[in-house]
Amino acid sequence: MSTQRIGLVGSGSWAEHTHAPALAAHPGVTFTGVWGRRPEAAAALATAHGVPAFSGEDGFAELLEASDALAFALPPDVQAPLATRAAEAGRHLLLDKPVATDAATGRALADAATAAGVASVVFTTMRFAPASAAWLADLARRDGWITGRAEWFGGLYGSDADPSPDSSWRREKGGLWDVGPHALSVLLAVLGDVEAITAVRGAPDLTHLILRHTSGATSSAALTLSAPKAAAGVTATFRGTEGVESLPEGRDTSVTSFTAAIDALLTAIDTKTPHPCDVRFGARLTELLAEAEGQLKAAGE
């Protein structure tokens, strides 16, 4: 596996606790620096890892020039235009989910990456966390699944939630957009692409999705960031001719999962083989979530 120069775009909590430690420790990465919208945050994170800090338009251009690939830890609507610029400049992409929050922007990013011939990976955690990734790969090799169910009950904004770093885009977009990509990435891994989706809103920020897949299977998802602590948790279950399979208990750390995503990007670069969770997959998730959001708005929900 070749060594790649990778810069980090983003300097918030997610970048601090997941992206930067994984990039700094990876033997196949030369960590080229941290770019942030807030210069002081970029400087603090960069100093912690002994790399240069960048900010502003000129700083982004400098990090781009110094890197073979960029890893993003930004809100989706900030990430998308910067990632499109990076792709057009021939840089490989390690993207956060969702890649964008409107279908046209997601498709434009995917088109730019395809036209430039760059490798890309979207960090949908369950597809890279070793335990869940192995489980999903095993299920995908087996036939006979008729349905699946994914529940992502986050408690970030629950009435009894502990204080957490503010994230305006998550508060605005809610569970559909924040944890929706996780649920869809699990369901699509086993049951295939989606040909029809229906969305219904329950309690505030509780969204239910019903999906019909191209395989003929159906599935459902429940998504929120506002669950009470006692109700918070993640589950995924598939049912078929071989019985019932449920998501393994226990979770790998975010650094371990992101390290696997880095491995996947490096492999895609070396082999010139697209990863299943590339930017086109990310754009497809955005299309599905945008369709669901449109249905909710049309229903006044």
PLM region spans:
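C-terminal helix-rich "cap/oligomerization" subdomain common to oxidoreductases
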Residues: 1, 58-61, 69-71, 214, ...
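N-terminal Rossmann-like dinucleotide-binding module
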Residues: 1-49
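Hydrophobic residues in well-ordered beta-strands that form the structural core
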Residues: 15, 55, 95, 120-122
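Beta-loop-alpha module in the N-terminal Rossmann-like domain of NAD(P)-dependent dehydrogenases
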Residues: 38, 49-110
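A short helix->loop->beta-strand "cap" motif at the edges of active sites that frequently abuts
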Residues: 51, 89-91, 116-118, 216-217
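A contiguous active-site-proximal alpha/beta segment in oxidoreductase catalytic domains
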Residues: 100-160
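Mid-domain beta-loop-alpha active-site segment that forms a flexible
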Residues: 123-130, 161-194, 282
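Contiguous beta-strand/loop segments that form the cofactor/metal-binding neighborhood of enzyme cores
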Residues: 181-248, 263-271
